[in-house]
């Protein structure tokens, strides 16, 4: 609202100054009306405008928060999280994620292509096609079926009790 009044006043002031050379062509009454409009804008108290804005701000109310309902939702989410933490598949995914994060952060035990024994092996997390690409103590793990090839590629992983490297030893 203030901005509109200031803009109107500025435009009116510009018109008065721009038409100053043309005073002779304009009638005195038109100039008088324009001058009165400028005076009216100048006399409008900004305090009344601020009071209106303050009144509107007072009328605005923040939504009430039901803290009990919020706490019960938080408790439900916590319980669901604990159930998920007990899930066998989630545990495996968490273990895989932790292993991957550790390998990315700490670096690898074996650099890609480094000979280990008679085999050349690739670092943990490196893409692989079969167990022979990985070190003897690692295996090539494919987390998804072949239709996701490229999206979730196979990679060398630490060998667990249920997974073994099936590549025949190098001669």
From Swiss-Prot:
Disulfide bonds: 121-135, 128-140, 132-167, 134-156, 142-154
Record organism: Oxyopes takobius (Lynx spider)
Main location: secreted
CC annotations in GO: extracellular region
Superkingdom, natural source: Eukaryota
Record carries keyword Lipid biosynthesis: no
Name this protein carries in UniProt: Spiderine-2b
Known function: Has antimicrobial, insecticidal, cytolytic and cytotoxic activity.
Oxytoxin-type inhibitor cystine knot (ICK) domain boundaries: 118-171
């Amino acid at each position: 609202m203030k901005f509109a009044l200031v803009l109107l006043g500025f435009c009116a002031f510009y018109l008065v100054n721009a038409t100053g050379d043309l005073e002779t062509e304009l009638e005195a009454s038109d100039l008088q009306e324009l001058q009165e409009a400028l005076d009216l804008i100048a006399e409008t108290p900004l305090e009344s405008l601020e009071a209106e804005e303050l009144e509107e701000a007072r009328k605005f109310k923040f939504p009430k928060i039901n803290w009990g309902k919020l706490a019960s939702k938080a408790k439900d989410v916590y319980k669901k999280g604990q159930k998920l933490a007990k899930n066998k598949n989630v545990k495996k995914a968490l273990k895989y994620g932790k292993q991957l994060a550790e390998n990315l952060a700490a670096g690898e035990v074996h650099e890609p292509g480094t000979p280990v024994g008679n085999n050349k092996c690739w670092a943990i997390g490196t893409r692989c096609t079969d167990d022979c690409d990985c070190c003897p103590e690692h295996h090539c793990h494919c987390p998804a079926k072949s239709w996701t090839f490229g999206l979730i590629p196979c990679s060398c992983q630490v060998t667990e009790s249920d997974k073994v490297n099936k590549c025949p030893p190098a001669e």
